[in-house]
UniProtKB/Swiss-Prot annotation:
GO molecular function: ATP binding; calcium ion binding; protein serine/threonine kinase activity
Protein name, per record: Calcium-dependent protein kinase 3
Positions contributing to ATP binding: 116-124, 139
SUPFAM superfamilies: EF-hand, Protein kinase-like (PK-like)
Motif J domain autoinhibitory motif location, chain numbering: 385-393
Residue ranges of coiled coil: none
Binding site for Ca(2+) 2: 493, 495, 497, 499, 504
PROSITE patterns: EF_HAND_1, EF_HAND_2, PROTEIN_KINASE_ATP, PROTEIN_KINASE_DOM, PROTEIN_KINASE_ST
Keywords, ordered alphabetically: ATP-binding, Calcium, Cytoplasm, Kinase, Magnesium, Metal-binding, Nucleotide-binding, Repeat, Serine/threonine-protein kinase, Transferase
PANTHER family (alphabetical): SERINE/THREONINE-PROTEIN KINASE
Domain comment quoted from the record: The EF-hand domain 1 cannot bind calcium due to the presence of a Lys instead of an Asp at position 427 and a Gln instead of a Glu at position 434 preventing calcium binding. The EF-hand domains 3 and 4 probably bind calcium constitutively when calcium levels are low, while the EF-hand domain 2 binds calcium following an increase in calcium levels.
Subcellular location: Cytoplasm
Length: 554
């Protein structure tokens, strides 16, 4: 693993979050008592903001009109504070928060007896965190069955780099002597394949809802020089059972990086019905994913594949010829625009084949406006959350990012919809101009020092606002449950002894995200971050202090 592997101590975790033995309760009471007599030398701007938000909620419930006036009244004060952030160039990457551990997985998770499904390298099980009772999905891979360990490591590396609403989230990994475990977000809505079987085919409106997500995620992957190489309905899961559930792409076991020069890949990979002709020759590029998407598109409109046969050999023979038609009665009511988009995906010559970005701009999507094209508005509370986030302490920002990463999509449904609406070009992140346009279209007045605000939201300094960055900044504090607070604390507390040290925080912040070794300047910055919230001045942060920092009662 790229990240440091450590042993996790279950007994300490249980003491903090579940059973709380007497000695730990006494320890916490002692800390609370001592904290009262300590005059903190550090002001918590984030804490002030949290208290101010509680006042605003009361005002909003009693007098909505007065609420907006009250918001505007506080804007000048926050704008002044934002000016002081102009010189703050603190940047970090969420990749460092996806840790790898050694030890017995079943000390931390209860696994279901029956697998949810099978992937390229192993089975996926439903799992429940023993302490937090949060449900996850766990991919279990036997080391003995791994024929190509470097390729599997690449799958993990690829997943750590991805941050998109339509990509399954990797949360952490475990490893013991026999197996490797990938802990991921749990999808409960079933496979796209199963829905196709159940419905037979989709109407064009719903098909546009599905295909826009598929082309968007392919555009996101291809921009990052990643080719999935196994696009098929079995590799898309519905997040939940709702009618407008988003889909998530899974199983990056066959995914590969390609270079910017010739784009060529040579390993034969894929599934017969969906594989592109060039893959069969052993010389192809990233547009093999577009061919597969075209096949999938064809299937969801009519219920059967464009290339079929009694055996894999017959199917592949049909694929090589690339001949298909729209002659069945199922196609009588399908628009010419839909057929044209399929043709552009199923073009034999990959050089002339449409790419994902071009597909998203196809007239069919403009004609069949699906759920992504709804007139989404951001309310003033989202803008206030942006301002509040920009004024947080560094460690608070790190914690909010982890909380956004660990939260399930049920809690973030509205924000997720807003993000997808703002992502007009389907790149999986939004530009500062797109966010500005979204705020203006929602009738919200842009604050002074808006560029400073955007720079604070762009936590990795990429110039664009990624999905988790947006969620962390827009997330309402009402989602800060003790479970989510502990999820963040557990990431920082690498050895699980109940305290966050300078070494642990430096490891999380810089390991895997920094070229070269950690400098003294880096260490000093981490020490300062700890000092800002270390109320008893012992040089460490315990869970009580962490909760105080996030303004959640322990």
């Amino acid at each position: 693993m790229n990240q440091l592997c450590v042993e996790r101590n279950l007994s300490i975790s249980t003491a903090y979050i579940k059973s709380k033995p007497k000695k730990y309760i006494e320890r916490i009471k002692k800390k609370k008592s001592s904290n009262k007599s300590i005059k903190s030398q550090h002001k918590f701007e984030g804490s002030k903001i949290a208290n101010k938000n509680n006042e605003l909620k009361d005002i909003k419930s009693k007098d909505p009109k007065h609420y907006e006036n009250h918001i505007n009244k506080n804007t000048k004060h926050k704008d002044i504070l934002l000016k002081s952030k102009r010189s703050d160039n603190f940047k970090f990457s969420r990749r460092g928060f996806i840790l790898s551990f050694t030890g017995n997985l079943e000390d931390f998770y209860n696994l279901s007896e029956e697998p949810l499904g099978k992937g390229t390298y192993g089975c996926v099980y439903k799992a429940t965190d023993k302490l937090l009772k949060i449900q996850r999905a766990v991919k279990v891979v036997s080391k003995k069955k791994l024929k190509n360990i470097p390729r599997f490591r690449q799958e993990i590396d690829i997943m750590k780099n991805l941050d998109h609403p339509n990509v399954i989230k990797l949360l952490e990994t475990f490893e013991d002597e026999e197996q490797i475990y990938l802990i991921m977000d749990l999808c409960t809505g079933g496979e796209l394949f199963d829905k196709i079987i159940k419905k037979g085919s989709f109407v064009e409106m719903y098909a546009s809802f599905i295909m826009k997500q598929i082309f968007s995620v392919l555009n996101y992957l291809h921009i990052r020089n990643i080719c999935h190489r196994d696009i098929k309905p079995e590799n898309f899961l519905f997040y939940d059972k709702s009618t407008e559930s988003l889909i998530k792409i899974i199983d990056f076991g066959l995914a590969a990086y390609f270079n910017d020069i010739d784009y060529e890949m040579k390993t034969k990979a894929g599934t017969p019905y969906y594989v592109a002709p060039q893959v069969l020759t052993g010389c192809y590029d990233y547009k093999c994913d577009l061919w597969s998407a075209g096949v999938l598109f064809y299937i969801i409109l009519c219920g059967y594949p464009p290339f079929y046969g009694e055996s894999d050999h017959e199917i592949l023979s049909m694929v090589k010829k690339g001949k298909y038609n729209f002659k069945g009665k199922e196609w009588n009511n399908i628009s010419e625009e839909a057929k044209d988009l399929i043709k552009r995906c199923l073009t034999i010559d990959s050089g002339k084949r449409i790419n994902a970005s071009e597909a998203l701009k196809h007239p069919w999507f403009k004609k069949k406006k699906g759920s992504f094209n709804l007139d989404v508005k951001m309310d003033i509370h989202v803008l206030e959350n942006f301002k509040n986030y920009a004024l947080l302490l560094k460690l608070q920002k790190l914690a909010m990012t982890i909380i956004a990463q660990q939260s399930n999509d049920y809690d973030l449904q509205q924000l997720k919809t807003v993000f997808l609406y703002l992502d007009e070009d389907g790149k999986g992140n939004i530009t500062k101009n797109q966010l500005k346009k979204g705020l203006e279209n929602s009738g919200l007045k842009l604050p002074q020092n808006f560029d400073v605000l955007l720079d604070q939201i762009d936590s990795d300094g990429s110039g664009r606002i990624d999905y988790t960055e947006f969620l962390a900044a827009a997330l309402d504090r009402k989602h800060l449950s003790k479970k989510l607070i502990y999820c963040a604390f557990r990431v920082f507390d690498v050895d699980n002894d109940g305290e966050i040290t300078t070494a642990e925080l430096a490891h999380i912040l810089y390991n895997g995200n920094k070229k070269g070794s950690i400098t003294q300047k880096d260490v000093n910055q981490v020490k300062k971050m700890i000092q800002e919230v270390d109320k008893n001045n012992d040089g460490k942060i315990d869970f009580y202090e962490f909760c105080e920092m996030m303004k959640l009662k322990y």
